[in-house]
Amino acid sequence: MQMLSVLNAFNSFPLAELEVGHHFYWQLGNLKIHGQVFLTSWFVISILVVASIAATRNAQRIPKGIQNLMEYALEFIRDLAKNQLGEKEYRPWVPFIGTLFLFIFVSNWSGALIPWKLIKLPSGELAAPTNDINTTVALALLTSLAYFYAGFSKRGLGYFKKYIEPTPVLLPIAILEDFTKPLSLSFRLFGNILADELVVAVLVLLVPLFVPLPVMALGLFTSAIQALVFATLAGAYIHEAMEGHGGEEHEEH
């Protein structure tokens, strides 16, 4: 009894605590969805839509301000797609790769720059969309569908030859690879963003003034790198599906 009283007294102290995986659910029929992910995802989409409208509403021959920023982002994405897919194949895939990159980039930075936890919900808490495994898995599955479509549309039924080349013995490994690609994409992005937010949250709880600032700056850099890695791998997978394992090398630029 004395031990229990000591433990209860210890638990009464206002110690900092950090919860992970506390979700706010919406009920749609028999389906439960993560409401906070929808809210923050639409917030990120709204930022991208507003930025696009602002950049193109009064386009100037000499870009400046938001137009200059968006044109720089477009050139960066176009170069990224060209490097991964080659001069002949990259243009149709710029919108897809660009959408992936911009959504992940803004989502990651929203988790680092916006104090989501200050917004109170009936239950659960807001966080970056990429801080939820469902978002990263959905992005990875979209990438998988994209490279299946790219390979089948470019090579037809010949696309399925990749499963038995150079020898049918490798068929199980080739099939397994189709599952490991989206898994690696989704868990890499989710793990890095979750770890970054947890480290910053713990440091803010322990030392709430200046120590977390360098970690937050590093988190911004890491968030940008994760968006770049995801988009780069998506482009590489699409190119591999179109050209095959023994396809031509990327054109030099």
UniProtKB/Swiss-Prot annotation:
GO cellular component: plasma membrane-derived thylakoid membrane; proton-transporting ATP synthase complex
Listed GO MF terms: proton-transporting ATP synthase activity, rotational mechanism
SUPFAM superfamilies registered for this protein in UniProt: F1F0 ATP synthase subunit A
Origin superkingdom: Bacteria
Keywords recorded for this protein, A-Z: ATP synthesis, CF(0), Hydrogen ion transport, Ion transport, Membrane, Thylakoid, Transmembrane, Transmembrane helix, Transport
Family, similarity comment: Belongs to the ATPase A chain family.
Protein name as catalogued: ATP synthase subunit a
